[in-house]
Every structure is written in C-alpha cells, then in structure tokens.
Design a protein with these regions (language model features):
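N-terminal helical cap/lid subdomain that shapes the substrate entry/recognition surface
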Residues: 2-103, 110, 114, 127
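Asp-based, Mg2+/Mn2+-dependent phosphohydrolase catalytic module
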Residues: 1-10, 43, 106, 110, ...
Length: 238
C-alpha cells in the first residue's frame, strides 16, 4: 500500500482513466457498423484502433490528435475493406469532446481536490481537452497535452515536461502520484521516471487491452476504479 500523505499532486491520464473513451468510440461507430460490418466484434475494432493510432503517434508525434484520429479511421476502413467516407473520418476526429466520463469520475475528482492539487497528462490536443474539462467539473492546477509536449505518451518527454512544471511550483517528483488506466501509456513510462503509479484497471472484467496496446508494467498500486481509490484514501487518512 502506498502512503497517500506524502503526495501533493495527483496527475491523471484522462482518456481511459477519467473519460470512458471506449464507450465514446463505440457509441459513435455502432450506427456506421450496422451498415458496414454488423458482425464485427467491438473488441477487434478497439484493438485495431489501438495499433493504428499508436502508429501515427509514433511516426508523426507533432500531429494534432484530431488528425491522428482522422488518419486512424482511414486505416481502419482500409483494414476491414470499407469504402472511404470523409464524413465518418471528420466525425471521428471531432468526437473527443463528447466522450463521457466514467460514472465515478466527477465524484472522485471532487473528493481528491479537497486533499491534493490535480493535474492531467493527456495524449490529445488543447482544443479537445478544453471540451472535456467542462465535463469533469473540477479545476486542474496543470494540464499537459501531446500538443504542448509535441509528442505522445509513452514518450518520456511529456512526463518530463509535466514534472518540470510541477517542480517550478515547488512540487518534487517524489510528491507526484500518477494515475492511469494504460500500462503502455502511463504506468511503464511513469515507473521509468521514478514516479509512484496507480493502475486503474478499468477493463478488469473484460478480455484484451481494449483501445490501448498491451504492455507489461508493475504499478505500485492497482485498483479497478477511481471509487476504489477514494475508499483506500479515506481508510488511510481517517
């Protein structure tokens, strides 16, 4: 068990941890699939998304996230033999701000903001994150996006930028608790940099790694929800 009292800031991954991006993606695409490929399992679609998105983020690290999504959708169409549809690509690229928070997100953030500064480290652009912040309903001390860092997680550069900015606020690396759903994007790079990490295993009751690449990494703490993390914190501080 980690000692919660030693931290001053909680840094969160956003999409997959705070925001249910898999639901946002599948809800948008399901009406299209009804015509294109009604028997395609959502698990296969999400794993294809993970692979193709990662390719563009690695090859074109300065590409803004809507453009990553637009190109990812084009590759998905090609992979499954669907006819190219620019309208679908544009809708997919512009959908980020409508992806919903998990049911426990807002209440958990409201609880944690009473105890810590909050920050977001996210693989999106600033405009998309700005829309999402309205759904989260709490203030964040710091947000660092792929657009800010000109690279995508799991690149250490995005983490290093956030760490440097927090150090300028008087917060040391040892006082940062990083929380994320993706071992690939968050837990593995966080551990490499010496951060204390919490893995929110949102997919604990599902097969596969969903919309992220599978990676082996050992977090300091594993929970299945933010609500569980809140409960652990309450038990330790009261």
């Amino acid at each position: 068990m980690i000692e919660f009292s030693k931290f001053k800031v909680l840094t969160f991954d956003c999409y997959g941890t705070l925001i249910d991006w898999e639901k946002g993606i599948t809800d948008l695409i399901q009406p299209w699939l009804a015509k294109l490929d009604p028997h395609l399992p959502s698990r296969l679609l999400l794993s294809s998304f993970a692979l193709m998105q990662a390719k563009f983020q690695q090859v074109r690290p300065t590409l803004l996230y809507p453009d990553v999504l637009r190109r990812t959708w084009g590759d998905i169409e090609g992979t499954f033999g669907w006819p190219p549809d620019p309208a679908h690509a544009d809708a997919f690229a512009g959908s980020v701000g409508s992806w919903p928070p998990f049911a426990d997100t807002v209440d958990s953030l409201r609880y944690f903001e009473r105890h810590y500064r909050l920050a977001i480290l996210s693989n999106v652009d600033n405009a998309s994150l700005e829309k999402t912040l309205k759904l989260l309903q709490v203030p964040f001390t710091l947000t660092v996006t792929a657009e800010d860092a000109e690279t995508y997680k799991p690149s250490l550069a995005l983490f290093n930028k956030a760490i440097a900015m927090l150090e300028d606020m008087g917060i040391s690396k040892s006082e940062i608790l990083h929380i994320g759903q993706s071992k690939h994007h968050d837990i593995n790079p966080g551990r490499k940099l010496g951060l204390t990490t919490v893995w929110v295993n949102r997919r604990h009751d599902q097969k596969g790694s969903g919309a992220t690449l599978a990676t082996e990494a050992e977090p300091h703490l594993t929970v299945t929800s933010l609500a569980e993390l809140v409960a652990l914190h309450k038990a330790q501080v009261t």
